[in-house]
Amino acid sequence: MIILGLETSCDETSGAVLVDGEVRSNVVSSQLCHKGFGGVVPELASREHERLIVPITEAALAEANITKKDIDVIAATAGPGLIGAVMVGLSFAQSMAWALGVPFVAVNHVEAHMFSPFIDQETAGGGPIGPFISLTVSGGHTLLAIVREDLTYRIIGRTLDDAAGEAFDKTGKMLGLPYPAGPAIDRLAKEGDAGFHRFPRALTSQSQTSRSYRDNFDFSFSGLKTSVLTWLRSQKEEFIHEHRADIAASIQDAIVGVLVEKAVGAARRHNIGAIAVAGGVSANSELRRAMDAACRKHGIALFIPSATYSTDNAAMIATLAGLKLSRGLQPLCRYDTAPFASFSAAGN
């Protein structure tokens, strides 16, 4: 089966081709036009997707050495995401599927991230997956879910306010780091001391207001952002400049510490022997190191996607479509699919 996947949920335009479960191409174009604004501008993102969707699709097909006539299925992100951006890819994919007379599959962007650690592991052909704990962390989402072998899942924890990726970006911006600040914190923190200052870790065993959070797998990062801002305002500029790497390492340690404690705690509480970490924040080097150490300590298998598949990409869209189709879990044709902006709007 040859699947063309398309992804336009935020600021990456991506096209990928999956042939019998193998990724033959995964073309990604990251939009640089937002850098001067310090964040993604939705209208600019939509216009860039409109400009790029055709050449990206053509590049994905060319790299995979196939033509439009070879395509069996077309899959695209239907959300969550920036609604205008989602509509560009969704309407293009539906129109292309209709014109070619092939089935169209709508894919939930966050669900696709959940299964991205298993790309290239021969799972799209129907091999076993699950059960595992999924920790999905990005700029817009932070959630924990129990994923079963039949690909269904139950969300057991989610952020009550801000996502981990947003916490990285906003605190990095407070430090004067360039956009996107998350990767900049990761690089700078390598030169710093994570024990320099202890920032709060809400809803964890280390929280000052902790009662019993053993069975609470929700997240909260708004307090961390406020704490960092308040602390920085109390310091002299010279001090901040001198210790910027230490501050970055301390912020990163607080965010990563929460993510690791929650994910490992969920696996142990529910007696599940595997954790899959996904989403843009899964590219963070300290999260990978700390999660690996914690999983080794407790005998838990760890799955993290390669850097290529950590950020938004169309290979994960095509892979999840292939997984579901191989199990007969999703209708082949849904031309009436409407885009949705939030994860809850998808009925999850």
From Swiss-Prot:
Residue sites binding substrate per the record: T136, V137, S138, G139, G140, D169, G182, D186, N284
Broad enzyme group: transferase
GO terms under cellular component: cytoplasm
GO BP of this protein: tRNA threonylcarbamoyladenosine modification
SUPFAM superfamilies per record: Actin-like ATPase domain
Cofactor(s) listed: Fe(2+)
Protein name, entry field: tRNA N6-adenosine threonylcarbamoyltransferase
Species classification: Bacteria, Pseudomonadati, Chlorobiota, Chlorobiia, Chlorobiales
Gene behind this protein: tsaD
